[in-house]
């Protein structure tokens, strides 16, 4: 069949594997697309090829394209639309292509949840759901769960003779609460919903504990743990073999060899038993007896080698001892008794889960709401039916979808779960060898297991499919990376060839998995990857684990700040693809990646102290923001004014403005009773003269409070919030404070949160406050409102998960010495998709508890899955870098850690030993041992190549490996003693005796005159608009322009002035619409109204600005000849920022300084279009023309042309410099009157 596929066009940019992925057909296809391999482009091209296929074209609505996010779906649609429009340019008469463009908006290109929603909306009558259902808010969902669970448990507690339930409570709850039991029920419910048949999965949990008539050999847990026993015995054998090699060295302790050989024989016996059965190992473990080491005279042998030999032998013995204590200290039948004893308790637990699921579903149904797991299960319910043997098979609806979809394409397939896989299976053909399923993903980037994604689905098909597709599915590897420099790729490959394998890591990092260079970069300086290992400071300044973490974060932040400043200040260059040239690095080119965000605030603080602009999208801190805290206290007081702390906080806040003395005076009027009662009593009496001001403040607030309380009983919560904002003036007040925009954004988020809350099934201020409290109790604080644009020139801090799919020129991966989060392994109960439920055996009567076989097996399985997931997270982090990769980690004792890491140097194979990889507790435990086997670490180690093979030691990668002393990072700047004394004297306003040698210096400083006086009256940095005004100015004095720009003195603060959009604000709003209007859609009133509403939702426009937009004027532009040219242009760029150097005499007409001086000019070009014959520059103007010029536009035209000529000339100059192409035409477009002026030089 392969010869029927279209051949790759000559001169095509596609690689052979990419082309194969574009055109391969006739079977299920799995594309393993490495990071930066262009998978989205391949996916789009495949869709386009199917749509415009000459022999058998497929309508776009006969394709189901499943993406991971809504943003990805929209991007996919946009790319397909752009590609179809290009085809239409070449084939303007093609009705088929026009039809596809019209079908595109209706096409099934969406997330799996959107597809499920589409199915449910179409076939809701097959389900017991209200067709008007809504998607539940996450917090509302959690509150409903708690409500349902509380009711169920209350009923259970009220049942007499409920013996098994109370046994369950005794075993899994504390004396104080049954929170642990609730957590178990909710966890089992959540895990079960990740399976196509939740009840069946729950039943299997119970069946696993029914061991009647079984031996330990029949248990899946024992079979799995035996594999772990073999693994640990093999590790012990490796230690003994290594010890034997050392003992046999010329100056090694040769008398130890005989004992070590006996140890190997003992371990061999245990390993043989492990290959037989659990019982065999148990019996062998009871007979373990280690020989006593023969005494030797240590002075006869190399002392270091003797120590190494004895240490390795002790490690081996510890491995066996651990097995004896954990697994073989109890007889096999006692493990079976655990299962028998726990079986009825687990049965009751599962029954509670089923009752909970039923009640929870019923409550959601009554409230007309569904959650995201419901979407999947309802869709699956519609697409499946039960066969005679009890298995699921496609329903009639599923068969309709099978007939409809010519192909199903799944992006990010590695993040699919079992339920989603079942849905996909029911709408695609059964046979893999004749299938129509196309899957794209990279299992090495599967990092969402915590969301119940199942990378095993991808891995199973990758192992099963072949590259030829013979007899089954086909797999295609896209290994070429078009993102990164060779140094980044080679560095990543070097690490992962050593740490990622099937046994530990779930994936073989073989030749097919390796990243291959696909990008072309100019030669760069200092592009080697780096590992900077910080030795923590020895000073015991900070106690405790939390304090140590703070210090580590500060050390790493200080080092990163130094590196960033050095790179920016030195003009470190990165490649700019748009201009195809190297340019100086900017702050926006840097990203700091962290596994999680606890360190982010400290890192931000340190970078800010160093003068580095930085941004992190923190998931906490919202409710801690002062303005939010104050408002929440206002609402608490409205709900219940008898609460002293919230009321005192409001009275002390800027809203009322009492000081400490006034608050004390109020309390003195009534030492008993609440603050509210005292305030009411105080206001009833006649105030003393000195208390008049206090009385007025309280009376004003008291009256407002009564009005709010009445309003809250009758009106909506969101209206109440806005009323409070307005009547207190607090919203305007915070706008006038530092970071005012951020503060106002935070208050708007509170308002929006209230509106979202009112869209749920809950109502009222009291429930809203409880709703917020539950959010905080669960630690679900939100981040502060976003007040930063994507293009801001700042260093970004984000989690590795957030960075997936992104790329940055310079990447710092920090916190590599932080321990992996293993808290899930420490829980009282464990859940696993395959092994079910595991917990300690707890006997409340005897007050004993001990580990069970199921708990040990699940813990081991989860640990290995965690290790594999962390490897994939590290892979994602390293592959974000385009040009420079810098890895940073902190250790407490570098010498001790290096001694541990150096064990890897004795290993001669690429893949490090399993025990090193599985025993890692942080990323450095993988990275450092890998790099210590490379020649570039020799500057640090000075150990030579030793036994490391040439292909590893001399691998083609460049690294800088360095240990940094933390003391040098935290050392304060030296201060001269003399200078310090002078400062102290000045602070105390003492006369300072002037030494004779200082007299001349003081005189020179006092009499000094600046040599560039001219430059002080002219700015070194100007905007184009300011230069335009300068040219218009008729005043001739040197300082006239600058004086003219000074803000006028206002009689009232701006935030207290009466609001109303200025001409400038209206102009800004129009420009915002012109920037964001979708040129791919028809420009109609309805479309524009929808887009403007979307801009308001995204906070790109305010409500007031949106109301001021004259939509008909925007449409008039696009109906004009110039507007039609914009719609038809090859490319359109809008709101293009630029910076350029300009001779001072060009910017300032009055310049009299040196002729070589330059100034920095900044501006933003409204619109530039590229047409076949060149570039046209367009500037939009909202000047009022009609009625302002008696002679109409004819009189206005020459005036306006002169007014804006300089501005457009500078824009054109900037474009010509950056694009290296002349600007053929410069146009002014005036919305008032729909006028166009072509500006000539």
From Swiss-Prot:
**Boundaries of each UvrD-like helicase ATP-binding domain copy?**
12-485
Catalysed reaction(s)? Couples ATP hydrolysis with the unwinding of duplex DNA by translocating in the 3'-5' direction; ATP + H2O = ADP + phosphate + H(+)
What is the organism of origin for this protein?
A: Bacillus cereus (strain ZK / E33L)
**UniProt xrefs under PANTHER family:** ATP-DEPENDENT HELICASE_NUCLEASE SUBUNIT A (PTHR11070:SF48), UVRD / RECB / PCRA DNA HELICASE FAMILY MEMBER (PTHR11070)
UniProt superkingdom: Bacteria
Q: Where is the UvrD-like helicase C-terminal domain?
A: 505-805
Gene Ontology molecular function:
3'-5' DNA helicase activity; 3'-5' exonuclease activity; ATP binding; ATP hydrolysis activity; double-stranded DNA binding
Cofactor(s) needed by this chain: Mg(2+)
**Name of this protein:** ATP-dependent helicase/nuclease subunit A
- Asked if the record carries the keyword Transmembrane helix, the reply is no
- Residues binding ATP are 33-40
């Amino acid at each position: 069949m392969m010869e029927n596929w279209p051949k790759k066009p000559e001169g095509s940019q596609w690689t052979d594997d990419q082309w194969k992925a574009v055109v391969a057909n006739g079977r299920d296809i799995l594309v393993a697309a490495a990071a930066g391999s262009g998978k989205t482009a391949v996916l789009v091209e495949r869709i386009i090829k199917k749509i415009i296929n000459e022999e058998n074209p497929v309508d776009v609505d006969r394709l189901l394209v499943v993406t991971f996010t809504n943003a990805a779906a929209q991007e996919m649609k946009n790319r397909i639309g752009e590609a179809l429009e290009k085809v239409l340019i070449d084939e303007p008469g093609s009705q088929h292509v026009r039809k596809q463009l019209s079908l595109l908006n209706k096409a099934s290109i969406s997330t799996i949840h959107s597809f499920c929603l589409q199915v449910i909306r179409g076939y809701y009558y097959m389900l017991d759901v209200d067709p008007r259902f809504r998607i539940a808010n996450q917090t509302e969902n959690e509150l409903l769960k708690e409500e349902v669970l509380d009711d169920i448990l209350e009923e259970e507690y009220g049942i007499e003779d409920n013996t098994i339930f109370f046994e369950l409570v005794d075993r899994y709850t504390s004396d104080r609460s049954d929170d642990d039991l609730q957590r178990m029920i909710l966890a089992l419910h959540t895990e079960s919903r990740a399976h196509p048949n939740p009840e069946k999965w729950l039943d299997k949990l119970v069946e696993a504990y029914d061991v009647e008539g079984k031996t330990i050999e029949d248990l899946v847990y024992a079979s799995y743990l035996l594999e772990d026993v073999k693994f640990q015995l093999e590790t012990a054998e490796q230690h003994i073999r290594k010890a034997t090699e050392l003992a046999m060295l010329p100056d090694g302790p040769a008398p130890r060899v005989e004992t070590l050989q006996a140890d190997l024989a003992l371990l061999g016996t245990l390993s043989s038993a492990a290959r037989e059965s659990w019982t065999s190992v148990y019996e062998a473990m009871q007979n373990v007896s280690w020989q006593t080491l023969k005494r030797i005279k240590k002075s006869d042998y190399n002392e270091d080698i003797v120590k190494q030999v004895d240490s390795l032998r002790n490690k081996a013995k510890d491995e066996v001892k651990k097995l004896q204590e954990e697994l073989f200290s109890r007889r096999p039948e006692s493990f079976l008794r655990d299962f028998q004893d726990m079986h009825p308790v687990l049965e009751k637990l599962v029954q509670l889960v089923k009752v909970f699921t039923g009640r929870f579903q019923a409550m959601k149904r009554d409230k007309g709401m569904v959650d995201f797991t419901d979407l999947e299960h309802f869709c699956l319910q519609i697409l499946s039916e039960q066969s005679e043997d009890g298995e699921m098979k496609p329903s009639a609806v599923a068969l309709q979808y099978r007939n409809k979809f010519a192909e199903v394409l799944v992006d990010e397939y590695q993040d699919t779960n079992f339920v989603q896989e079942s849905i996909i299976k029911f709408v695609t053909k059964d046979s893999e060898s004749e299938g129509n399923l196309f899957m794209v993903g990279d299992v090495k980037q599967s990092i969402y297991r915590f969301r119940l994604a199942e990378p095993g689905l991808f891995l199973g098909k990758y192992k099963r499919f072949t590259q030829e597709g013979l007899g089954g599915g086909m797999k295609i590897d896209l290994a070429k990376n078009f993102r990164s420099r060779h140094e980044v790729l080679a560095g990543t490959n070097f690490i992962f060839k050593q740490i990622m394998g099937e046994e530990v890591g779930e994936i073989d990092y073989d030749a097919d998995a390796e990243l291959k260079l696909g990008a072309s970069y100019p030669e760069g300086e200092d592009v080697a990857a780096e590992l900077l290992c910080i030795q923590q400071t020895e000073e015991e300044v900070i106690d405790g684990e939390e304090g140590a973490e703070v210090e580590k974060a500060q050390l790493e932040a200080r080092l990163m700040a130094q590196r960033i400043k050095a790179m920016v200040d030195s003009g470190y260059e990165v490649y700019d693809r748009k201009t195809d040239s190297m340019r100086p690095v900017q702050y926006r080119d840097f990203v700091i990646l962290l596994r999680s965000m606890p360190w982010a605030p400290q890192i931000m603080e340190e970078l800010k102290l160093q003068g580095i602009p930085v941004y992190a999208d923190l998931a906490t801190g919202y409710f801690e923001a002062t303005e939010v805290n104050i408002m929440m206290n206002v609402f608490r007081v409205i709900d219940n004014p008898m609460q002293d702390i919230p009321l005192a906080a409001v009275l002390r806040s800027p809203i009322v403005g009492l000081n400490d003395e006034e608050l004390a005076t109020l309390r003195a009027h009534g030492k008993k009773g609440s603050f509210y009662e005292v305030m009411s009593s105080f206001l009833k009496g006649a105030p003393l003269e000195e208390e008049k001001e206090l009385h007025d403040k309280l009376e004003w607030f008291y009256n407002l409070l009564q009005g709010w309380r009445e309003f809250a009983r009758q009106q909506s919560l969101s209206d109440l919030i806005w009323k409070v904002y307005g009547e207190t003036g607090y919203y305007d007040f915070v706008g006038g404070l530092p970071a005012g925009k951020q503060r106002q954004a935070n208050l708007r988020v509170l308002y929006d949160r209230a509106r979202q809350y009112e869209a749920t099934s809950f109502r009222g201020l009291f429930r809203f406050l409880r709703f917020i409290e539950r959010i905080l109790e669960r630690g679900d604080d939100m981040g502060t409102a976003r007040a930063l644009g994507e293009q801001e020139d700042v260093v970004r801090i984000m989690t590795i998960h957030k960075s997936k799919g992104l790329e940055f020129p310079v990447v710092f991966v920090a916190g590599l010495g932080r321990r992996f989060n293993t808290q899930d392994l420490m829980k009282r109960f464990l859940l696993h998709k395959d092994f079910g439920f595991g917990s300690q055996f707890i006997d409340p009567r005897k007050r004993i508890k001990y580990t069970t076989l199921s708990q040990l097996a699940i813990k081991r399985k989860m640990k290995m899955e965690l290790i594999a997931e962390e490897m994939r997270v590290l892979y994602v982090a390293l592959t974000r870098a385009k040009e420079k990769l810098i890895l940073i980690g902190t250790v407490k004792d570098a010498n001790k850690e290096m001694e541990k890491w150096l064990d890897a140097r004795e290993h001669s194979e690429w893949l490090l030993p399993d025990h090193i990889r599985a025993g890692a507790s942080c990323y450095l435990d993988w990275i450092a041992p890998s790099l210590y086997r490379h020649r570039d670490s020799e500057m640090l180690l000075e150990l030579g190549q030793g036994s490391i093979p040439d292909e590893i030691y001399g691998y083609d990668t460049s690294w800088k490996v360095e240990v940094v002393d933390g003391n040098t990072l935290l050392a304060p700047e030296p201060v001269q003693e003399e200078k310090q004394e002078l400062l102290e004297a000045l602070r105390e306003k003492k006369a300072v005796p002037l030494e004779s040698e200082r007299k001349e210096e003081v005189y020179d400083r006092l009499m000094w005159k600046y040599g560039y006086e001219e430059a002080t009256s002219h700015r070194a940095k100007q905007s184009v608009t300011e230069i335009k005004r300068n040219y218009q100015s008729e005043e001739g004095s040197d300082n006239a322009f600058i004086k003219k720009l000074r803000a006028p003195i206002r009689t009232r603060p701006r935030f207290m002035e009466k609001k109303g959009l200025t001409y400038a604000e209206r102009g800004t709003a129009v420009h915002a619409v012109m920037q964001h209007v979708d040129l791919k859609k028809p420009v109609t009133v309805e479309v524009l109204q929808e887009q403007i509403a979307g801009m308001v939702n995204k906070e790109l426009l305010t409500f007031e600005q949106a109301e001021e937009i004259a939509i008909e004027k925007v449409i008039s532009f696009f109906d004009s000849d110039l507007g039609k040219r914009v719609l038809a242009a090859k490319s359109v760029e809008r709101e293009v920022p630029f910076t350029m150097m300009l001779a001072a005499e060009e910017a300032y007409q009055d310049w009299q300084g040196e002729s070589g001086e330059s100034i920095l000019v900044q501006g933003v070009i409204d619109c530039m279009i590229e047409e076949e014959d060149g570039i046209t520059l367009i500037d939009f103007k909202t000047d009022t023309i009609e009625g302002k010029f008696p002679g109409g536009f004819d009189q206005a035209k020459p005036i306006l042309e002169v007014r804006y000529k300089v501005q457009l000339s500078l824009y054109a100059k900037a474009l010509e410099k950056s694009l290296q192409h002349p600007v053929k035409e410069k146009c002014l477009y005036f919305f008032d009157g729909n006028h166009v002026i072509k500006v000539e030089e």
